[in-house]
């Protein structure tokens, strides 16, 4: 049997064009087609269920309404976002607005709970 390491070295040194030509020659010699398994796999995949929806991984926390206790909501928005007093006040008064965007599910739920505890109405989208 031929030295396998030498075969691997020889194959590794081939250019892309040489590898394509080798592939064609092997297909002819062995009577196979490299494209057939791909077509069969694609056809089999089409028979399965339709596109499976990926679970959403990024969420936006929306301040829907400030509620009666606006001062506490402003304090909480400042703590969550790191905004200054004026920016946080403008955000709260301009509701509905996004407080935090692109956070994971656990963080979004935590922020929503903090806002609701402060007296606001919040939503996670």
UniProtKB/Swiss-Prot annotation:
Record flagged with keyword Ribosomal protein: yes
InterPro entries assigned: Ribosomal_bL12, Ribosomal_bL12_C, Ribosomal_bL12_C/ClpS-like, Ribosomal_bL12_oligo, Ribosomal_bL12_oligo_N_sf
Coiled-coil ranges per UniProt: none
Keyword terms: Ribonucleoprotein, Ribosomal protein
BP term (GO), one: translation
Top-rank taxon: Bacteria
GO CC field: cytosolic large ribosomal subunit
GO molecular function: mRNA binding; structural constituent of ribosome
Pfam entry (one): Ribosomal_L12_N
Annotated Gene3D superfamilies: 3.30.1390.10, Single helix bin
Entry similarity comment: Belongs to the bacterial ribosomal protein bL12 family.
Complex formation: Homodimer. Part of the ribosomal stalk of the 50S ribosomal subunit. Forms a multimeric L10(L12)X complex, where L10 forms an elongated spine to which 2 to 4 L12 dimers bind in a sequential fashion. Binds GTP-bound translation factors.
Functional description taken from the UniProt entry: Forms part of the ribosomal stalk which helps the ribosome interact with GTP-bound translation factors. Is thus essential for accurate translation.
Designated name of the protein: Large ribosomal subunit protein bL12
Species assigned in the record: Rhizobium leguminosarum bv. trifolii (strain WSM2304)
């Amino acid at each position: 049997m031929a030295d396998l390491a030498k075969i691997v070295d020889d194959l590794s040194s081939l250019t892309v064009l040489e590898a394509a030509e080798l592939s064609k020659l092997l297909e002819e010699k062995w009577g196979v087609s490299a494209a057939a398994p791909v077509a069969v796999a694609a056809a089999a995949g089409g028979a399965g269920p339709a596109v499976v929806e990926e679970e959403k991984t990024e969420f936006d926390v929306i301040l829907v309404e400030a509620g009666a206790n606006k001062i506490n909501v402003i304090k909480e928005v400042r703590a969550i976002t790191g905004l200054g007093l004026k920016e946080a006040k403008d955000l709260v008064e301009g509701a509905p607005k996004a407080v935090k965007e692109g956070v994971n599910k656990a963080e979004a739920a935590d922020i929503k709970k903090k806002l609701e505890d402060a007296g606001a109405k919040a939503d996670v989208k």
